């Protein structure tokens, strides 16, 4: 594996990571450093393991029987994969937004407040401030401030995805995982999400899975190319897209493969 992502402080360190769906070996000996306050994109053909890798970062796989990870994922030096590490604290530090917008069946306000209430005790005034802060971070406040008590499902698809991002940042995580957040959105909504990602990296470490090569090139500082569960190449996005070290990477990016 070619690895040229050496600048900036590491927020997440992945060491000798292997992942299994039952007996199927889905992720093979991945080693990489995710840089702090940068956007890292995972690219690769369908089934290559990029979403699986993303979901190891907050142990989302534990919701499903028969799945297991081996190795280390260090968040500021703390191994997230050990049983000693509280899973609820991991998910407070490592937020996630899924491919399809998933607003909770409750008001816009309560969508934001729900996760906060799990981890903090805030007064009504403090919660109001947090809700406004999170919706502002997701560039949604001005669009919904007069209808906070309407259902989150009443919003458009693009607004729903920004609501999910606001919900993710409301608990003030350190890392934000985005699993193909724009795949179900129109170009205008996609552009808003991409602008939002550029803003979020100033306060969060962002990792995004995308099938869209142009999106990876536009949004990310670092890019990881995966194939058949292996990390084939990882480095600065400009280098990966302009002068990749491996022919396999070049073939995928230029459309000759995948």
From Swiss-Prot:
Entries under SMART domains matching the protein: AAA (SM00382)
Binding residues for ATP: 44-51
Primary location group: membrane
Pfam families: ABC_tran (PF00005)
UniProt subcellular location: Cell inner membrane
Gene3D superfamilies in the cross-refs: P-loop containing nucleotide triphosphate hydrolases (3.40.50.300)
Top-rank lineage group of the source organism: Bacteria
The reaction(s) this protein catalyses: phosphate(out) + ATP + H2O = ADP + 2 phosphate(in) + H(+)
Stated family: Belongs to the ABC transporter superfamily. Phosphate importer (TC 3.A.1.7) family.
Role according to the record: Part of the ABC transporter complex PstSACB involved in phosphate import. Responsible for energy coupling to the transport system.
Name of protein: Phosphate import ATP-binding protein PstB
Organism of derivation: Bordetella pertussis (strain Tohama I / ATCC BAA-589 / NCTC 13251)
């Amino acid at each position: 594996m070619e690895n040229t992502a050496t600048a900036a402080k590491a927020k997440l360190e992945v060491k000798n990571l292997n992942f299994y769906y039952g007996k199927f070996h889905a992720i093979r000996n991945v080693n990489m450093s995710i840089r702090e306050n940068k956007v890292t994109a995972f690219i690769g053909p369908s089934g290559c393991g990029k979403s699986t890798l993303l979901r190891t970062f907050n142990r989302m796989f534990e919701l499903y029987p028969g799945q297991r990870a081996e190795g280390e994922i260090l968040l500021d030096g703390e191994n997230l994969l050990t049983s000693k590490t509280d899973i609820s604290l991991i998910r407070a530090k490592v937020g996630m937004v899924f491919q399809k917008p998933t607003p909770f069946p409750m008001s816009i306000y309560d969508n934001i407040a729900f996760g906060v209430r799990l981890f903090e005790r805030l007064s009504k005034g403090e919660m109001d401030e947090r809700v406004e802060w999170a919706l502002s971070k997701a560039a949604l406040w001005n669009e919904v401030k007069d209808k906070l008590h309407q259902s989150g499902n009443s919003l458009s698809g693009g607004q729903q995805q920004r609501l999910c991002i606001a919900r993710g940042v409301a608990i003030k995580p350190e890392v934000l995982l985005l699993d193909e957040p724009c795949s179900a959105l129109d170009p205008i909504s996609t552009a808003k999400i991409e602008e939002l990602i550029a803003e979020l990296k100033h306060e969060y470490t962002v990792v995004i899975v995308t099938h869209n090569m142009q999106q990876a090139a536009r949004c990310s500082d670092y890019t990881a190319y995966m194939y058949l569960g292996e990390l084939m190449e990882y480095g600065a996005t400009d280098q990966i897209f302009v002068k990749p070290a491996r022919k396999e990477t070049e073939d995928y990016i230029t459309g000759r493969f995948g």
